[in-house]
Curated annotation (Swiss-Prot):
Short name of any one Pfam family annotated for the protein: PCMT
Organism of origin: Shewanella oneidensis (strain ATCC 700550 / JCM 31522 / CIP 106686 / LMG 19005 / NCIMB 14063 / MR-1)
Catalytic activity: [protein]-L-isoaspartate + S-adenosyl-L-methionine = [protein]-L-isoaspartate alpha-methyl ester + S-adenosyl-L-homocysteine
One MF annotation (Gene Ontology) recorded for this entry: protein-L-isoaspartate (D-aspartate) O-methyltransferase activity
Sequence similarity: Belongs to the methyltransferase superfamily. L-isoaspartyl/D-aspartyl protein methyltransferase family.
Function per UniProt: Catalyzes the methyl esterification of L-isoaspartyl residues in peptides and proteins that result from spontaneous decomposition of normal L-aspartyl and L-asparaginyl residues. It plays a role in the repair and/or degradation of damaged proteins.
Keywords from the UniProt entry: Cytoplasm, Methyltransferase, S-adenosyl-L-methionine, Transferase
Top-level taxonomy: Bacteria, Pseudomonadati, Pseudomonadota, Gammaproteobacteria, Alteromonadales
Protein name in UniProt: Protein-L-isoaspartate O-methyltransferase
GO biological process entries: methylation; protein modification process; protein repair
Alphabetical list of NCBIfam families matching this protein: pimt, PRK00312.1
Superkingdom per UniProt: Bacteria
E.C. numbers: 2.1.1.77
Length: 211
């Protein structure tokens, strides 16, 4: 990272701490990840604003607060193996890869997946496996997962993702259409408990359509 980018990332982490993010490992990952790397040059000047930004293909890079919040919720359960549904720009994956031993990530838009893979390689993050496919179906061959994070809003909770959770595993997912709720779902053998965290706004999770 350049000195300017490092200063900007550190300042962003401080803003997120002021906004309620408490996990020091999450704040450290935010502070040392160059968010401008995950944006077009035309938007690089907005990289350290606490806002979602377009990345093309009708998709967005999530607001840093939401990235940090979802990561914090996941880390409370100390997951060893995590599935991310919706690689997008790769920014959320870059944060997670610094914090969990093994990350699997699925993206349905090939162009975004290729870019994300290149970015994480550039950051020397090598504990990440990438799949081009329908995130609604998860990644069965690599399951089970201690944690699953979905970075797009599902109209309903995908059964495939629930089935790929390990015992005691958690699913962090925005659910809903116009009004969306960020939910944490925990597996207890063959039953699940759910908790509403807060109201959020995400692009929709598309079922079965590759691009």
């Amino acid at each position: 990272m350049t000195r300017v980018a490092l200063t900007s990332a550190v300042n962003l982490a401080k803003k997120l701490q002021d906004a309620g993010i408490r996990n020091p490992a999450v704040l450290k990952a935010i502070s040392q990840t160059p968010r401008e790397l995950f944006l077009d040059n035309a938007l690089a000047h907005k990289a350290y604003e606490n806002t979602a930004l377009p990345i093309g293909q009708g998709q967005t890079i999530s607001q840093p607060y939401i990235v940090a919040r979802m990561t914090e919720l996941l880390l409370q359960h100390q997951p060893q193996k995590v599935l991310e549904v919706g690689t997008g720009s790769g920014y959320q994956a870059a944060i997670l890869a610094q914090l969990v031993p093994e990350l699997c990530t699925v993206e349905r838009i090939k162009a975004l997946q290729i870019q994300a893979r290149q970015r994480l390689k550039r950051l020397d993050l090598h504990n990440v496996s990438f799949k081009y496919g329908d995130g609604w179906q998860g990644w069965l061959n690599r399951s089970p997962y201690n944690g699953i994070m979905v970075t797009a809003a599902a109209a309903k909770i995908p059964e495939a993702l629930l089935s790929q959770l390990a015992e005691g595993g958690v699913l962090i997912i925005p659910v809903g259409e116009e009004t969306q709720q960020l939910m944490r779902i925990t597996r207890h053998s063959d039953r699940f408990s759910s908790e509403v965290i807060e109201t959020v706004k995400f692009v929709p999770l598309v079922n079965g359509e590759l691009a």
